[in-house]
Structure formats: structure tokens, C-alpha cells
């Protein structure tokens, strides 16, 4: 909208189908059944699980209505994601890479989203971001590093708010891994022996269906 001056998608969702209800091609609507039961609003809430049952494959509903038009986002943006959640990082990091904003910041933290959002330091940062763009305050926000990462260390304290020039890191070494169903492992080389595994995939709180 023309009046929108800045946005701060913290722990965002930008593609409902690919990031949430059918990640990896596996339908999973149970989590949203729980959300519908927990969230009470006067005018109701969309039943995403029911829509997944109605439209199990990618179509205009998922791609037009439930996927962000990244190219249309041009306002200053402050995005936040984490390494520790399996819900929001995909959507947030995809948005970071694809939005058209020239003024954008990314912070990847090392905790769960709710404690991070309530940390005084980061609440103050968010206030500075909005005050800078909505009120025109000269508070030094533009000097904030464009990208800050967290490095998780299982043997010691994590490194937090590490400034880097860009993300993904330019010297990232992307490697392809191959499934080995027989050994239930990942291998560096393509597998020459055919193997398979089967499993039951069922929604939360339901009985297995053969």
C-alpha cells in the first residue's frame, strides 16, 4: 500500500504451501488444526487444513493468495529468523533474498522466537527501526550492520550478532547429498543400489490408515 513506510517481518511466513502445510511434498495440516483451536477471533479464522484437503496440489489459490509477491516489497525491511525453529526460517530467508527493498536488514538469532522478541535489546532495536523510518528520527539506525548471524556452538557459548557483509555467505560451499534408504543415511556419492523405505504419514491425533 502507498502509505506503508516500513515493515519488520520477524519469524515470517512467505509461502504457506511450500513452507508450512506441504513441506517436501508431505501434507501436514495437523499443526494448523491446533492453531484454529487456540486462536479465537470474532470473525473466525481460515481453515488451512481444510483448504489443503480441497487443494492438495499447487494451484492458483496457493501460488496467488498464499504466497508473497516479493517483487512488490520495496519499503525498508527488518527481517528476523532463527536457526532453531522449523516453522519460520524458510519463509523469512526466502523473503530476504527476493524482496526488492534496497534498505533491508537481517538478523538470525540463536533462541526461540518468543524469548527473542521479548529481549529488551531487540525490542529497542525494533523501536529504533520504526522511529527512524516513520518519525524521521536521526537515531543511527542506518549504521546497524545489514546482516547479523548467530553461530551455534554445542560445546560452548554461541556467537551472537556476528556482522557479515551479505547472506548467504559468498564463500558458501554447496554440496549435494544422496539418500541411502537401506542404511538410512546420506552419502556424498550417487547410490548404485536401489533401495526403499515405507512409513505411515498421518495428521496429529488421528489413527494410522493403511
Functional labels for PLM-detected ranges:
Residues 1-142:
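Active-site-proximal cap/loop segments of hydrolase catalytic domains
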Residues 115-210:
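C-terminal, loop-rich substrate-recognition/catalytic regions characterized by aromatic stacking residues
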